[in-house]
Amino acid sequence: MVLASNHSNIEIKSDIPLINSMESYSLDKNMSNSIISTNLNDFSNWARLSSLWPLLYGTSCCFIEFASLIGSRFDFDRYGLVPRSSPRQADLIITAGTVTMKMAPSLVRLYEQMPEPKYVIAMGACTITGGMFSTDSYSTVRGIDKLIPVDVYLPGCPPKPEAIIDAIIKLRKKVAQETYRDRTKNKRENRFFTSNHQFKFVPSIHTGQYISDQSSIPLLDLPLERTISEMRFDNKFFMNEEELLPKGRK
């Protein structure tokens, strides 16, 4: 790689003929500070440091803190973060908020649609451990690391925008130290979609026999004429005036 400022100071000899509009000149001592020697792995990591495009994924109040990064006060564009709405164009997903059992398959589907290499930041206590819903909630996932691999954990309820920037900087350091084998390694191994919730199933009291079978009518101890004359409307029963009168006064 040759810097443009140093390349402009190189004197080109006019007596050397040009071949295909390009000149080949030998390297001298003046160009020793103009060349950066590196390998393909480090060059790829350097290029990806400023192109981490996050996927907009917010399910709770933590996303309000993440949205404040877009403003001019914090300005996360200086780190090369461009919010994307499609998982196929994103390199990073920041899970901000509570993840429920119903939302878990959608989160896994979004993660699988992201191209490799991809990264995950778990933002907030509800995302990491379930937060205040982890004790008595039957529908909250106790940590998204049961669903997808997490690279950076960001605790807080909710975390400050400065903490989000610090997590992004730590992720950039991790990206800079990666190798090709680390990027191509399957991160989905030993991952499972399960839960420790214990559901107790009880038999239903609604058998449906009152609709399909007439054998349930004698159990009500009601006359057949009274059952036929009843009209059900909005879970209320309406009867004739004769049935409301006491016996012997009809």
Curated annotation (Swiss-Prot):
Cofactor binding note: Binds 1 [4Fe-4S] cluster.
A GO biological process held by the record: photosynthesis, light reaction
Lineage top rank: taxon: Eukaryota
Cellular-component GO terms for this entry: chloroplast thylakoid membrane; respiratory chain complex I
GO terms, molecular function: 4 iron, 4 sulfur cluster binding; iron ion binding; NADH dehydrogenase (ubiquinone) activity; quinone binding
Membrane topology type: Peripheral membrane protein
Keywords for the protein's UniProt record, in alphabetical order: 4Fe-4S, Chloroplast, Iron, Iron-sulfur, Membrane, Metal-binding, NAD, NADP, Plastid, Plastoquinone, Quinone, Thylakoid, Translocase, Transport
Catalytic activity, EC: 7.1.1.-
UniProt cross-references to InterPro entries, sorted A to Z: NADH_UbQ_OxRdtase-like_20kDa, NADH_UQ_OxRdtase_20Kd_su
Residues that coordinate or bind [4Fe-4S] cluster: C61, C62, C126, C157
Necessary cofactors: [4Fe-4S] cluster
Localization (cell): Plastid, Chloroplast thylakoid membrane
The keyword Transcription regulation belongs to this UniProt entry's keyword annotation: no
Catalytic reaction equation(s): a plastoquinone + NADH + (n+1) H(+)(in) = a plastoquinol + NAD(+) + n H(+)(out); a plastoquinone + NADPH + (n+1) H(+)(in) = a plastoquinol + NADP(+) + n H(+)(out)
NCBIfam families according to UniProt: nuoB_fam, PRK06411.1
Biological role stated in the UniProt entry: NDH shuttles electrons from NAD(P)H:plastoquinone, via FMN and iron-sulfur (Fe-S) centers, to quinones in the photosynthetic chain and possibly in a chloroplast respiratory chain. The immediate electron acceptor for the enzyme in this species is believed to be plastoquinone. Couples the redox reaction to proton translocation, and thus conserves the redox energy in a proton gradient.
HAMAP family noted in UniProt: NDH1_NuoB
Family: Belongs to the complex I 20 kDa subunit family.
PANTHER family, A to Z: NADH DEHYDROGENASE, NADH DEHYDROGENASE [UBIQUINONE] IRON-SULFUR PROTEIN 7, MITOCHONDRIAL
Subunit structure: NDH is composed of at least 16 different subunits, 5 of which are encoded in the nucleus.
Protein name according to UniProt: NAD(P)H-quinone oxidoreductase subunit K, chloroplastic
Primary gene name: ndhK
